[in-house]
């Protein structure tokens, strides 16, 4: 059922490929509806982390309430929920979409449909949203709006004939976009008298208010003093404040079915208010939670260690603070012989990992060393137990392993047809299995591959961009596990295993990878006073070796002429000393060495 009030509400989000102008369009909508004065307008209002502005990406979902007056005098409340565009934050996007009834699909008029346009669009369709295509960047000379419209109709299969043609940069035709939202996005429904059901689509920690939950009320009413219960954790809290975003907080008396806003209830930790959870009243609970909740599952793991061992506690505090705001981040203490005490951290994907590392360095001024990222392998041992392996150092000996499985992703790559050969070559090199390909139009092709996650985890995206001159776009999702013949590759320096450099590789590639790493390390590790052998080993078998020659003083400099035995005595003495040093000497591994190991593909 729909109340009179709900008829004038529109909840929508904006989805797009990276850099197609989603956050800029959001800025223009905020400006056009007069939500912020020009003085308060800051480019990309909704991206409020420095890192988001710098990288030009949206990391956390944001929401803002716009009041739009039509020429007919009617006033509409538009709730815009800005979503992250990157594949790592797929779950956050899907929850933000579940809070809406419609989605604006922004497509760049110069580039047309890209891989993430499709991925996000399918997510929106999965949530039964009404999709409103908007074509952006029509002020550019290379814009081809008519072709792009045709493409949207052919590839996605939605009507795009009267799609608004806008330029978010110059503010051209923004009114058309607002009209399209009002006309096409359905108004919310839901009974205001029913038991409360509200979806948390984002939550973060504020040092004054505690955890602030961004919610979409689906049914019922929530106001200050209500006792609420989170359905997945079962915890009960009392509401301290409810309000709306303009983008800053503005407390209101109550939020009813159809509204988007925030609620604070002195919750101490984001983990207690998970994205996707359902809020209901403690006394008058809803029968079942809203569907679609799933705990965030990390896909990529990496070790993070302080460069200065004494900073361990500071690193722990920093990670805890980040975790308060980021429920997808997980970490547990681990020790490494080479690096001392640190943490094994789990991330949603590479971008997420990168962002966390950068925030640790930037917001907490920590110097950190990170080890090669790895994925979760499933190992069935000979005695039948199943273990999940996130750290290569913990891999059991080959005699105990019956079966080893690695995660596989389904990836779609959209590329100009000229580069199909290069892309296929790259995918095959990364153990990809070709599934199918389709032409989107005469110039662009979509290729679908199944590739082990381990192969794309580090530099697949960079390699793809460089082979296609930056034109290809890429999107992936995890589809399951598959058995694989994998071995653990160890690196020994001066006959000691450096545990932080161990990695899991396919058996047929172990030799090439080992040789490559040994050569790379030889270039990077500084020379010492004694000779250092660098060895790559699989099990007890050494498969590659390089030697860093010792620095030596010219002990014969003071012998002018003289007997050969005198010179020999001096050289023997030097050799003896170097031998002793090598027994007691230890090798410091510089941070660059860890990074270099990752980049051995080139």
From Swiss-Prot:
Protein name: Elongation factor 4
Membrane topology reported for the UniProt record: Peripheral membrane protein
Gene3D superfamilies in the cross-refs: 3.30.70.240, Elongation factor 4, C-terminal domain, Elongation Factor G (Translational Gtpase), domain 3, P-loop containing nucleotide triphosphate hydrolases, Translation factors
Pfam name, any one: GTP_EFTU
Localization: Cell membrane
Example GO biological process: positive regulation of translation
Gene this protein is translated from: lepA
EC number: 3.6.5.n1
Function summary: Required for accurate and efficient protein synthesis under certain stress conditions. May act as a fidelity factor of the translation reaction, by catalyzing a one-codon backward translocation of tRNAs on improperly translocated ribosomes. Back-translocation proceeds from a post-translocation (POST) complex to a pre-translocation (PRE) complex, thus giving elongation factor G a second chance to translocate the tRNAs correctly. Binds to ribosomes in a GTP-dependent manner.
GO cellular component terms listed in the entry, alphabetical order: plasma membrane
Reactions listed under catalytic activity: GTP + H2O = GDP + phosphate + H(+)
Organism, as annotated: Clostridium botulinum (strain Langeland / NCTC 10281 / Type F)
Ranges for domain tr-type G: 7-189
Family per record: Belongs to the TRAFAC class translation factor GTPase superfamily. Classic translation factor GTPase family. LepA subfamily.
NCBIfam families documented for this protein: lepA, small_GTP
Presence of keyword Iron-sulfur: no
Keywords annotated in UniProt: Cell membrane, GTP-binding, Hydrolase, Membrane, Nucleotide-binding, Protein biosynthesis
Record GO terms (molecular function): GTP binding; GTPase activity; ribosome binding; translation elongation factor activity
